[in-house]
Amino acid sequence: MGLLLSVCSCVLLARRKWSEGKSEVIHACAWSAFLELLALLVCVLHAAGVLGPQIRGVSWLILALSLGAACAPVRYLLQRKLDNGAPRVAMRLLVIARDLVLMFFAVFTSFVLVELPWNDALGAMPVTMACASLVILGIIFALLYLLFQRSTFGIAFGALLFMGVGLAQFFVMSFKGAAIVPSDVLSLRTAAAVAGGYEFSLSQELFGCLSAAALLAVALSFFPGLVEHGRARLASVGANIALFCVGAVGVSCLFSNVKLSEVIDTDTMCWDPVGIYKYQGFIPSFVTLAQNLEIPIPEDYSEARADELIQGCADEFERSQGASRGSSGASAQFAQEKPSVVAVMNESYSDTSIFTTFNGAYDGARYPDALPDALLCGSVVPSVTGGGTANSEFEFFSSASMGYNGAAKMAYTIYDLSRVNTLPAQFKELGYDTVAYHPHNGANYNRTAVYDAMGFDEFHTIGDFAGAESFHAGVSDKATYERVLERLEEDDDPQFIFDLTMANHGGYVLDNIPEPYSTEVSLDGMGDDILSQVDEYIGCIKRSDDDLDWFIDRLRALDRPVVLVFFGDHQPGFTGELNDMLFPGEDQLSHTQRVHRTPYFIWSNYDIEGSAQEGERLDMGLNALGPKLLQLIGAPMLDQQKAVLTLQQQLACVNVNGYMGSDGVWYSFDDVESPFYAASEELRTIQYRFFGSRVQ
């Protein structure tokens, strides 16, 4: 019926008005054909079962499209009435008013099309975020309006584009429980390759959005196109293109120089992409991450120079650190033994005794001091404190420091890591099974997608810990260690296992620490609210130490070679207040770095060739921990990892705030007077080559 009405209206229009304006008639009929083809496509997809059982939704969608197809030819007649029925000035004012109304309608509808299919918290979105979405959409639609010569098709293209964005986010949410981030756009080919493995099904809300899009198309079919002819037409085309170019340049400058996070305080770290996207809206969240995507290119950078630096540092490593008999012996031993490697990143594990012993009531975390036979131990300096866990694991896996990527970035949510060399991928190439455990939501920090990109074969999240023992903020450390041990006992293949614990997570106001871990400390000048958090946190660390004792005892008794690397991801948030109260008047950089310090150790349950295993101490950045692990156990190393360890001789610790030179002094990256400035710039260049150039 809809098709018949459309054909009849087009034929009637052509017979009556062909001689008066062929291009306008063709334009109207093209709109009718386009909408009718969309209706036909919906019918075919529904018949094929692709659209699921939503009969009512399909019916409304087809009705909306058919209505648009039948009404499109009427646009010409109404436009003629408007042109002939009003004075020229009044007519232009009416056209401008109509254009503005329809443009706003298109912008608002597109906002709904982007958000409604997947955002069940749309009603709670702050007005500022909704307005930001509308402003950004308005700018985009204005540019499309000019680019398409003020015709219907530019606005239709924009509406179709944002409807596609909403659909894509709906399916990504349905399949992966994740938000689309800029790095996903960089890996569209990969996404398309795996899309065939999912079953597509549309919800009632989605059909409502599609119907709204169809009604928008109906409204847009009345949108006036360019009606000038001859020289006037050429002048109008030129003016529109010029305005588009000026606008595009202006938007580009705006995007580069005005950070949305600074204007409306959008979240740049995005630890919970789905939650943040729902609260802020898709468009402000995506734009914020995109603005934070770029890694500064080092001065005088070239691939040839970077490769030369990497090779030179790798050669220096082989001449010095890699030339010993112990090193060659460890390499031969690794090739023969293929030890399993377990990496534990313990949530918020740190030693608050570096600030104070609280009048002698607390001696500090037991590790690494409780492990005299460690291969290596000391402190690492994460780039985050109080939160931002994913950047710590990123630095460990990639050997790249956030110090050279830029502050206020969350690597997992803005970069495609599938082309980056990482520890999981390295061990996978060596024939290892690669497994990750995290007793929480796998979508946090985009981990589910990122772990797959980095080479993990399996990722076990909270759903795999049903019935597990809990402590404080989640599944206990011991429960995760039990899963690791089960894997080591049941699978004889060499394993690379990453265990990200959860129990110590803040906040520390739950008042749920049982005996014998409950603690009560005191400190003159410190408020009770902070002291109560300290009490709860210390109780968590005491329990973590006991669980770690238990785990290491089991590993010692295990009849297979295992290497354990353990580190804390960051300090708890309240240590900033301890630091400010107890250490006033320090230089700012050294003061800041005190809250960027957590314990680590590397240990094995077997004797490693060339290692005294007497608890040697060495502080380092998390970017050096992975390469140092490989070096100690004799595993094959990449040249970039050798380069990191070579430069570590001068740059003892590197994180987002700066670096500690081999003289024990902290320096900022822009301190050109530093005796280690040249080494820092070399590491910046090397890191851009092996990381930055691969993700942008």
Residue ranges and their predicted role:
Residues Q311-E337, A343-N346, S350-Q696:
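Solvent-exposed soluble domains appended to multi-pass membrane proteins
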Residues K176, V185-A193, E205-F207, P284-E294, ...:
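Short alpha-helical interface patches
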Residues P117, A179-P182, F200-G208, A232-L234, ...:
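General structural signal for secondary-structure boundaries
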Residues T128-V135, R189-A192, F207, P284-V287, ...:
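Generic detector of well-ordered alpha-helical segments enriched in charged/polar residues
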Residues V251-A343:
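Membrane-interface segments at or immediately adjacent to transmembrane helices
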